[in-house]
Amino acid sequence: PDGQTLAYCAFRSVATGADIYTISVNGGEERRLTTAEGLDDGPEYSPDGKHIWFNSVRTGLMQVWRMNADGSEQTQMTFDETRNAWFPHVSPDGKQVIYITYHVGDLEPGQHLANYNVELWLMPAAGGQPKRVAELFGGQGTINTNSWAPDSRHVAFISYRLNEKK
C-alpha cells in the first residue's frame, strides 16, 4: 500500500511448505514473515498498510488469518470447522473482508480448488460473525479474484459453469 513493499507467497523447501515474504520493490533481501508448517498463501495488505491478511492451513483446515505488516501477531480470523476459507480481500474502507470457502472433504485443505461449488462470505475486519453472501461454481482463478468497488459497497467476482457435452 505504500508502493515500496511487496508481499507474496513462496515455496522454499519441502520441509517448511509455502510461506509469506515481503521484499522492497527496489529489490534486496526478502523477509520471511510466516514459518508455520504447510501452506500460507494469498497475502493482501489492508488499505492502511498496517496488516497483511492471508490464508493458512496451520490449524489443519485452511482458514483466514491476519498479521501485522511486520509479521508479528499472527491471528486466526475464521474458525469454521466445516469449511476451508481462502483468499481474503479487505474492503477499501478497511471495515470488511470478503473470502471464499469450500466444504471440508471436497479437497485436501492445502489444495487449490477449481471447478467446485464454493461460497462467498463477508465478515467485519475487526473480527466477528461472518455471513454467507453467495454460493457459486468456480475456484482458483475465478472467484478468488473478487474485487471491491471503491466505495466498499459492492463486490465484483467471476463465476462460471462448465459446458456439458451432449
Region roles according to the model:
Residues 1-166:
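Sequence signature of WD/YWTD-type beta-propeller architectures
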